[in-house]
């Protein structure tokens, strides 16, 4: 009968690793299978959530063709299956040749872990082939290679078989083939070498992932539908683009350009290493105190040991390393680094938002964008803190604990700690990955809820106009209910995770404590060793209890980073060409030559638009709504790039000069003036930030708003409110004119600047605008034709084309579209005048 003896051949700890001219078999066959099992589990965790769940529909026929690459994949599958069975066959061989000898425990561990690791590789091999078939069926292009986790697993397995050769001269191994047992083990090693080598070579080729390995028939009518379905599936694992995310984080971990902060980072990393040493030394000194007390040691030795223990405990903190002197010092020093990180991320995002095009901003909700910025900033700082000072130290403590118990106690203790910690981490990652979809859905609904509230409050007046308060509250209530439903799912899944973690920790502590108590009763360990084990394990489990929280927070931050990365990946639509120089302004001549432009929908907004504005002239753009008048102004300001043609200022193509220099010469007075939630003075000063108070007042006087400002209780320091809602329409328009006067541009663009005002305000502001436009090249978009009768040239635009051009009198004499528009507006004014006359009720 075969029985199991000590973990290693000789009773005692796992080490030394090197003995008798070779690696210790106990050490080798503990390290290698454990490493392979860890790699296999990690590969499963990272690859499983990333697998596409789409499957080909019934309108597709997918079958394997008899080509030259089916055989290599069949060989690969056969070798992977053999690799699963071989460790168990090796154990059976040892049992058959043992002949009454007690087998060491490490052989059982090596067989089980080796077989499980190979099973992970086999499952990944089949899963990746299935994913490749489904991806190609959807029309999704993919790289025909295995995942990094699977390749790493096969590489390490093959490297381990080669590593065994360094023990060729060791009598502990089977190279001599002196008896049947050694001959069997040598034969199994040859099989392992051939199998692992074959899988390594075939893995680099990946024959099962090649498109030639099968024939796909897809009905063309369904192909686009399936591709769209593939693109609309749920987002993949939070570990997608992990390398890119970590590279971004590392750039903020090491504060470039600040030697002082770099030195602080090094100090913090050193303090983190000191914390790891304290976590080992504190239980050791506690054990020594117990042993000294039980052995009735002299007071001098006991006092010194107790003093040292208390000092180390002071440095470490309350058993978790979270409240000790070292940890608090590290937290204090890290504040500046964290502020540097937060500032860098916020500035990068804010700068990127201003670099994006007007087209992008018009298609986004401001509330959602700001939420993405807030979450992205907090996610980067949180990730740095959790990864550097929580996750990495916790993993380091686990590895140190496994090594310590294996070397100084017994390999069974190291095995218990390893299995318990591995199972804990594996279940934590798997369950948390499962929870990720609930968190994502909750985040999406939170964005919707926030955007709905912001949209309603921004349109406060409109809500009041239509007595829609109840409707808005009901919409908001429905959004909150949806959010809370998703929040409940996320919280309930958290309870499942916590209970799973608690069960694993309890079982591991029970097994280790019973084993330690047994060895103490057998007098193989001292009472102090039992105390050390309990103290160390409890100390190890304390941060491990938080590992689930750390992982969840990291995953949450990665989820929050996804939207931030999407935002950062938005390409700038309008950007300066390489080598662009400043605009050299001379007189201000504007030329549009055969300009074509279309928005994202593909419909051409402007078609072959050509005109010239001479220096100092005023050109008016008139026509029906949607004709493309405002688009011309936006193209000149370069909010968009034209599809074809050319726009020049003083003979220079505006696409070849810097945007900053171009816009510094252009002033815009829009129809809907939006002011910042700041003082009137600062809103005017926005035209030229460096302007003094006297210049601001002079601009206000020129715009005809100085006296109105002085009538306010706080004068120029009056807050205008969000979007300038505290000012009337005419007052806001005059502030915008004053802002433009202060900028003193060479070219003026007026986009229906007075169309939303009453007649009296319109006339007053027209007078102010006339002062601004004197001796400046001006383009006016006008709705009321009476405001542009004195323009040097009037362009009539319809459906993106210039259909008429000339002065007011010439266009009237032509009797075309302009004359018709003029007559309609004149009749409208006459009707208003008649309606406004007092009537006799009697």
From Swiss-Prot:
Task: Cite the domain annotation text.
Answer: Contains two independently folding units, the N-terminal transmembrane domain (residues 1-205) and the ABC-core domain (206-842) are respectively responsible for the lysosomal targeting and the ATPase activity.
EC no. given is 7.6.2.5
Q: How does it sit in the membrane?
A: Multi-pass membrane protein
The record ties this protein, via PANTHER family, to:
ATP-BINDING CASSETTE SUB-FAMILY B (PTHR24221), ATP-BINDING CASSETTE SUB-FAMILY B MEMBER 6 (PTHR24221:SF654)
Q: Which Pfam families match?
A: ABC_membrane, ABC_tran, MTABC_N
Please identify the protein, giving its name as recorded.
ATP-binding cassette sub-family B member 6
What this chain does, per the entry, is described as: ATP-dependent transporter that catalyzes the transport of a broad-spectrum of porphyrins from the cytoplasm to the extracellular space through the plasma membrane or into the vesicle lumen. May also function as an ATP-dependent importer of porphyrins from the cytoplasm into the mitochondria, in turn may participate in the de novo heme biosynthesis regulation and in the coordination of heme and iron homeostasis during phenylhydrazine stress. May also play a key role in the early steps of melanogenesis producing PMEL amyloid fibrils.
Q: Show the InterPro entries listed in the entry.
A: AAA+_ATPase, ABC1_TM_dom, ABC1_TM_sf, ABC_transporter-like_ATP-bd, ABC_transporter-like_CS, ABCB6_N, P-loop_NTPase, Type_1_exporter
**Which residues are listed for ATP binding in this entry?**
623-630
* PTM annotation, UniProt: N-glycosylated.
Its tissue distribution reads: Highly expressed in the liver, adrenal glands, and testis.
Biological process (GO) annotations held by this record are: cellular detoxification of cadmium ion; heme metabolic process; heme transmembrane transport; porphyrin-containing compound metabolic process
| Region annotated Required for ATPase activity, chain positions | 1-236
Write down the PROSITE patterns for this protein, in alphabetical order.
Answer: ABC_TM1F, ABC_TRANSPORTER_1, ABC_TRANSPORTER_2
Mark the transmembrane ranges: 27-47, 73-93, 107-127, 148-168, 186-206, 264-284, 306-326, 376-396, 398-418, 500-520, 530-550
Q: Which residues lie on this side of the membrane: Lumenal?
A: 1-26, 94-106, 169-185, 285-305, 397, 521-529
Q: Does the keyword Phosphoprotein apply?
A: no
User: Quick one: where is this thing mainly located?
Assistant: membrane
Q: What is the native source organism of this protein?
A: Mesocricetus auratus
Q: Name one GO cellular component term.
A: plasma membrane
